[in-house]
Regions:
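C-terminal outer-membrane beta-barrel translocator/porin domains of Gram-negative envelope proteins
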Residues: 5-11, 16-35, 42-45, 64, ...
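Surface-exposed, low-complexity/disordered segments
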Residues: 34-37, 41, 48-55, 60
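Charge-patterned, long linear interaction tracts outside catalytic cores
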Residues: 54-56, 64-69
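Membrane-spanning beta-strand positions in outer-membrane beta-barrel proteins
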Residues: 55-59, 155-157, 304
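Conserved active-site loop/cleft motifs that coordinate metal ions or position small ligands
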Residues: 244-246, 303-310
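Short glycine-rich, acidic/polar surface loops and turns
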Residues: 290-296
């Protein structure tokens, strides 16, 4: 079998902000800049099954990237701070980049599924790719999952996961590793509200600990069904209910990061040399951990839903999330 497709994805990042003098006396202009990358990708692939449960995948993608800066101008009165004109904007073209990347993957899947997920078997995917063109980097993925019955309907689900990029331009593709699909209890919002208001510039916000170009994650879950004869008699719109307790651990780092299991109080979240070369030393990345409980259900037989309650470890300012 084969696949062929096209996708376009915009990515936005904060730029600079500040005020500049205006030609009108008593006024200034407040400027905000946002950096935007638009990825346009044409991709294709061939799937070659070698058995009922495993296959090889050969893919090729070509990507064109347009980089520009979005600028917003707001004139305002110096004395009062009130706007004196409508907000205006412009787009400044910066550069264009292009690269192609062939990929090769081996996939195995013999898992048996229930209403809300697998309950027996294993799944794995190992993939490598090398970009060719303006941006050059090596990309690798390793995802291994097991589902083992412990006793009766109780299932132990485990996962080991790695994704990363290395090479000359790998640092251009940084990502955030605190999503609910990787390490629960460490979403971006939980840091922004609690831990980005303390420390100086060299300490930065703790959210930087989960930003990088490589990630390694381990998840352990103990799952069991809640659907029984009592619940079956209630008019609930769920085809199945399942609960679980879990433990997550993960690490996100860059090519030059200093990796630790536990962080010291004075370890920097960002490279201090970008403020003062004399400070030297890379940023420190440490393993983040969390535990919690989860409730899952299949709404109307076709829409799986999940509710997680997690307690991040090593974050005294956040008790649960």
């Amino acid at each position: 079998s084969w696949v062929l497709g096209f996708q376009q994805q915009p990515y936005y990042g904060y730029g600079t902000a500040g005020s500049i003098p205006s030609e009108v006396e008593g006024e200034a202009i407040y400027i905000e800049q946002y950096r935007r990358y638009i990825y346009r990708t044409l991709f294709g692939g061939i799937y070659y099954p070698t058995s009922r449960f495993q296959r090889f995948e050969l893919g090729l993608e070509g990507t064109l990237v347009d980089e520009d800066v979005l600028e917003y101008f707001q004139p305002y009165e110096l004395a009062s701070g009130f706007p004196t004109d409508v907000l205006r904007s412009r787009t400044v073209d910066v550069a264009s980049y292009s690269y192609a990347m062939p990929t090769l993957a081996w996939v195995f899947d013999n898992a048996l599924y229930g209403y809300v997920g697998p309950f027996l078997g294993r799944r794995s995917r190992f993939e490598v790719g090398q970009s060719i063109g303006t941006w050059q980097f090596f990309q690798g993925t390793a995802d291994y999952r097991r589902y083992d019955k412990v006793a009766g309907p109780v299932v132990l689900a485990t996962r080991l996961f790695y994704f990363g990029r290395r090479g000359r331009d790998a640092e251009l593709f940084q990502f955030y590793g605190g999503t609910t699909e990787l390490v629960r209890g460490h979403t971006y919002g939980s840091y922004e509200k609690n831990e980005c208001l303390v420390g100086g510039a060299l300490n930065a916000c703790a959210v930087n600990n989960l930003i990088g170009s490589q990630s390694a994650v381990g998840n352990v879950e103990l799952r069991w069904p809640l659907w029984n004869s009592v619940l079956a008699g209630l008019p609930l719109p769920f085809a199945g209910l399942e609960t679980a307790v879990f433990f997550d651990a993960g690490l996100v780092w860059d090519n030059d990061s200093n990796i630790k299991w536990n962080r010291d109080e004075d370890d920097p979240f960002i490279d201090p040399s970008q403020f003062d070369p004399a400070l030297g030393g890379p940023e420190v990345r440490n393993v983040v951990r969390s535990w919690g409980a989860s409730l899952r259900g299949n709404l109307l037989g076709f829409l799986p839903l999940r509710l997680d309650y997690s307690r991040p470890l090593g974050r005294p300012m956040v008790k649960h999330y």
